[in-house]
């Protein structure tokens, strides 16, 4: 469906001086700014979207609450699909799963391709022992007006498929059980969660996944899972540190991953924003002059730097 930004038709925003700005799609910003190049990815939430003559909506969307407080939003809704087919397709390892992603990516109506690596499935088996024992990777798919006969011909026999709302929701719960278990594990072990939100150009997705796996192995980090939005070359690496040494190694490795993603033309934040803990990554993706252009917009709308201090930019005097 594309980014959230393009589905926003209007906003009411309270600015830091107490004024209220009401804008609709097509209302242009009242200042000129240089264009900041975007990463060559389907998603990017790192920094502000800036380009000459841009809409106010495009500036506020994804700004992490650093420019104003959105109190009302008008959204464009799409018709609910009459029929959605869902499935969990299991593979023996990553390679056939990645081949399937390449083969299926442009299937009409395919709206979701989610990836689980072997370690993700091992963690999920604690709650879902029905996962085939030989499965070393999996894809969760959803297709509008799907053809079950097609999937019967192209998916391994032990895959799961459902067309009912109830079963489809069960598959969604299966997907969301993984980050829940990751968070539970992290809490029990007493370390902060170490995770990525990186995306790379689709053509580099396989390369990036292999890079993750090789570097984790070389650094002797065994407690991790890799899962997420493989259709967008946007996978999450979660390191579940079990010692101080593993935590410190994981921190260094996540920074290395971010640098490599940018080298491949990717982004340091695909969907979740930088917040405070990842604000330091902004300088990996943008030049000092580009970041200064973003800060100039921040100073214009929040001259005292009071909104969401430390989000996106490390704490800075006005």
Model-flagged regions — what are they?
Residues 170, 274-279:
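Short, highly charged C-terminal tails/helix-capping segments
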Residues 26, 118, 273-274:
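Short, ordered loop/turn segments at secondary-structure junctions
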Residues 59-62, 198, 228, 269-270, ...:
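Short conserved micro-motifs on helix faces and helix-strand junctions that flank
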Residues 61-63, 69-256, 260, 264:
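C-terminal substrate-recognition/cap domain of FAD-linked oxidoreductases
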Residues 267-274, 309-312:
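Short acidic/histidine-rich active-site segments
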Residues 238-245, 277, 281-285:
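Conserved PLP-binding active-site segment of the aspartate aminotransferase-like
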Residues 279-318:
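Activity-critical C-terminal alpha-helical subdomain
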Residues 1-107:
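FAD-binding subdomain of flavoenzyme oxidoreductases
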């Amino acid at each position: 469906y594309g980014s959230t930004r393009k589905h926003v038709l209007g906003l009411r925003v309270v600015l830091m001086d107490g004024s209220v700005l009401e804008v609709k799609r097509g209302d242009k910003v009242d200042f000129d700014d240089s264009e900041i190049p975007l990463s060559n990815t389907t998603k990017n939430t790192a920094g502000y979207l800036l380009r000459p003559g841009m809409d106010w909506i495009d500036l506020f969307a994804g700004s992490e609450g650093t420019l104003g407080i959105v109190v009302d939003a008008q959204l464009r809704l799409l018709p609910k699909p009459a029929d959605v087919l869902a499935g969990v397709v299991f593979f023996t390892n990553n390679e056939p799963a990645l081949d399937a992603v390449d083969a299926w990516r442009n299937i009409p109506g395919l709206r979701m391709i989610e990836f689980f690596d072997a370690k993700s499935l091992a963690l999920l088996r604690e709650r879902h022992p029905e996962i085939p024992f030989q499965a070393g990777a999996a894809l969760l798919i959803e297709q509008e007006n799907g053809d079950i006969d097609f999937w019967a011909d192209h998916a391994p026999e032990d895959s799961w498929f459902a067309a009912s709302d109830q079963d489809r929701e069960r598959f969604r719960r299966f997907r969301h059980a993984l980050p829940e278990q990751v968070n539970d594990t992290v809490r029990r072990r007493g370390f902060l969660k170490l995770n990525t939100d990186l995306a790379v150009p689709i053509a580099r997705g396989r390369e990036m996944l292999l890079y993750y796996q090789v570097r984790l192995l070389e650094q002797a980090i065994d407690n991790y899972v890799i899962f997420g939005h493989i259709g967008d070359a946007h996978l999450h690496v979660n390191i579940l540190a079990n010692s101080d040494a593993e935590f410190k190694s994981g921190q260094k490795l996540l920074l290395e991953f971010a640098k490599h993603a940018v080298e491949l033309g990717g982004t340091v934040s695909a969907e979740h924003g930088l917040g405070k803990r990842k604000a330091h990554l902004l300088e990996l993706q943008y030049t000092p002059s580009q970041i200064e252009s973003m800060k100039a917009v921040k100073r214009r709308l929040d001259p005292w730097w009071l909104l969401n201090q430390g989000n996106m930019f490390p704490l800075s005097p006005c």
